[in-house]
Amino acid sequence: MKLKNIKFFFQLFIPDKNKILILDKEGSEDLVQYVLSDVKNIKIYDLKRITIYFNITFILKFLKNILNIHINNCSFIKKIYIIYIKTEIEFIDPQIIITYNDDNSIYHSLSYVIKNRTFIAIQNGLREKFIRDRIEFKINHDYLYCFGLNDREKNISTNWLVKNHRPVGSLRAGIAITKFNSLKKKYDICLISEYEPRKRNDPDNHHWNDHWLLVTEIMSELFKKRNYQIIIALNGHGGTRELDYFQSILPLNVAYTNPNIELDSYRAIMESNVTVGFCSTLLLESLALNSKALQINTAQDNSYFQFDSKFIHEYSQINNLEKRIDELMSIPYDSYRKSIKNFIPKYMNIDENNLPQSQINQNIKEILLS
């Protein structure tokens, strides 16, 4: 995080105590509304905001921490930033520090320097090889609520430290199941947008964008050939440029989600027979949303989406892809679900009778009482 993105505020008194600290605003509304709705004494800590305390007690504690805490492989400015947050958290004195940003470097740095607190993270995206290769800091979870058993295997193989894996599925998918449980199918295909305002051959993202653009061009060709009922799940990146891009390459009769409406992409998936994409988290989440998932792989390896071949189409020519999609659409959903039942615990382990939000809520209450 760059200092220029941080806003500074000033305060005379030390922060109030709270039992639960939500670290960072990302996903905090979901946590408060759906996971912690019956829990009191919650504070949301905004990592883009620093409160400067003109308080002698705070200042002395901060200086003591600077002298006593050693953080390796970290710039001086980041070290001071982490120690300052640690000092503030010591005054807040939470039992639980929870985040919906499971690969946040500040969260993991704090987990090593703050003792006698329970650190809980909720997985909010796929953690495939091309993502893991870019993470240079140490991962350390007390509890990780992950998508499935497959995540546990990947974490172990990558030497990510997780004391307690809780494979409960996707929290947002669980919320969507509650919110949209009576939807009927309206679309043949939902294409998941992974749009980023980047140019081709951008090495900064391991050429992921190049593959996604190619997948989009392939699907555009297929959509012009066939009269499918289509909806595009927009991600909202790039503002109006994302919609402009799709409208420039797709037929006029295509529907689009509204990124400004909560969980609208999840609604679109639940209304679609087949969900198609490259390496979006939504593609895996569709397994819990009564849709049939298909990755179109143009990368010739599994570094972007390492799952069973049942969910992957190795692209060679458009006729083969067309045949694969038609086969998927023709299968009754109950038959499809039965054919993938052994993969559900591994990839998206949602129990519709005990959704992720309920499991996390119950576990948090148990920790608070312990």
Feature annotation, model-predicted:
Residues 29-33, 78-83, 206-221, 357-361:
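Well-ordered, non-membrane alpha-helical segments in soluble/globular domains
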Residues 52-59, 129-135, 154-157, 175-180, ...:
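Short, charged, surface-exposed secondary-structure boundary motifs
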Residues 47-50, 101-102, 124-125, 170, ...:
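Short loop/turn segments at strand-loop or loop-helix junctions that form parts
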Residues 235-289:
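Donor nucleotide-activated moiety binding/catalytic core segment of transferases
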Residues 141, 281-351:
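Catalytic binding pocket for nucleotide-activated donors in carbohydrate/polymer assembly enzymes
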Residues 348-370:
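C-terminal alpha-helical cap of glycosyltransferases
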Residues 2-13, 18-36, 40-175:
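Active-site and donor-binding regions of nucleotide-sugar-utilizing enzymes
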Residues 173-246:
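Conserved catalytic-core segment of nucleotide-activated headgroup transferases in glycan assembly
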